[in-house]
Amino acid sequence: MDAERIVFKVRNQLVSVKPEVISDQYEYKYPAITDKKKPSITLGRAPDLKTAYKSILSGMNAAKLDPDDVCSYLAGAMILFEGVCPEDWVSYGIHIARKGDKITPATLVDIVRTNTEGNWAQTGGQDLTRDPTISEHASLVGLLLCLYRLSKIVGQNTGNYKTNVADRMEQIFETAPFVKIVEHHTLMTTHKMCANWSTIPNFRFLAGTYDMFFSRVDHLYSAIRVGTVVTAYEDCSGLVSFTGFIKQINLTAREAILYFFHKNFEEEIKRMFEPGQETAVPHSYFIHFRSLGLSGKSPYSSNAVGHVFNLIHFVGCYMGQIRSLNATVIQSCAPHEMSVLGGYLGEEFFGKGTFERRFFRDEKELQDYEEAEATKIEAALADDGTVNSDDEDFFSGDTRSPEAVYTRIMMNGGRLKGAHIRRYVSVSSSHQARPNSFAEFLNKTYSSDSR
């Protein structure tokens, strides 16, 4: 008998089949660089910067930009942003630069040029006979990179928000050390013609390169990052949420994971902490791995670690955090079970304040306080004969140990208590819920629960 087959009848005919499903052809790829080669892209022939500036600025004013020309110009303009490396810079074994070296964004990556000439049409003609200043180049580079940030703003009813962001970014590139080179609202008008540019690999690569450079190097034009900052930890919402969670509850990653009482966390935790990655290394290629093309399918996204993501944001909802209430539920990752665990953890880390004296008039007052606290602890640890001292953690209402929390969940049959439900309903009902958000899920799931 084949253990993988099932047997049944169809119109009195015996049928034996082996059920199979479509395999996931898009495997998660980790960004670790193993060949010691810098991330690279291939672009057309390097342009004359004056010609390129004139052409790109004309295209921006006409709301008609060629992405290949824009990428070629952005890569060529990197030479204008020379800075000094503050420390030895090494990532995944690649020596990017040494302390004191003069570097540009191009130092971080390998840009291969072909003989293909760009269009450089200069449509609309700009009356520019002199060479553009570095400030003018910096303003144009900054405005072009803002198109990346604007194209990452997606969702319903984002029109006004996007316009306001565009206006604020435009204002940055009108004031020193930058200089005004376009009329007001040009950026938003241009964006409408380039709404999906964040999906263009070369444009995304260059945005990430500029961001990685300006995040490390103290530079006059560092404000260019306003358009590229969204490339940092892109497609890492699962890992970023977990990092924020442990900071919020004031635990180490190891301590926090002990509270994750569900078998589906195992694969996700293993995926999130794969050895050999530079998740905790400052200024690593890891931070910009998505934009630099080092991973096609991120193992750190909300979908890749959906149970972890759901749990963290249910705890956040319990704590009344707007970001968690607005986040999108990963429907395929046990949201009902995660909401139960989130309620208990929310109660443990939010429902009870941790208050204690930390500041004193002098050393004697501090010493007296510590001695008094030590006496209290000794008295609390004494066995009163009613509960085995070895089991106190399981029954003490004040403890936050994983064992105690797990026991309380089991003693309540793996269901939320009335207090948990009332808290969930309270925070979600007073919030304008977005479609498929945690606020909407909690409202629909628990608003009619009478517990």
Curated annotation (Swiss-Prot):
The keyword Phosphoprotein applies. Phosphorylated by host. It comes from the Viruses. Disulfide bonds: none annotated. Keywords: Capsid protein, Helical capsid protein, Host cytoplasm, Phosphoprotein, Ribonucleoprotein, RNA-binding, Superantigen, Viral nucleoprotein, Virion. The keyword RNA-binding applies. Its main location: virion. Homomultimerizes to form the nucleocapsid. Binds to viral genomic RNA. Changing residue 107 to M: In strain: Isolate Human/South Africa/Rv6. This is Nucleoprotein. Belongs to the lyssavirus nucleocapsid protein family. Coiled coil: none annotated. One of its GO terms (cellular component) is ribonucleoprotein complex. InterPro entries: Rhabdo_ncapsid (IPR000448), Rhabdovirus_ncapsid_C (IPR023331), Rhabdovirus_ncapsid_N (IPR023330), Rhabdovirus_nucleoprotein-like (IPR035961). It is found in: Virion; Host cytoplasm. It holds the Pfam family Rhabdo_ncap.
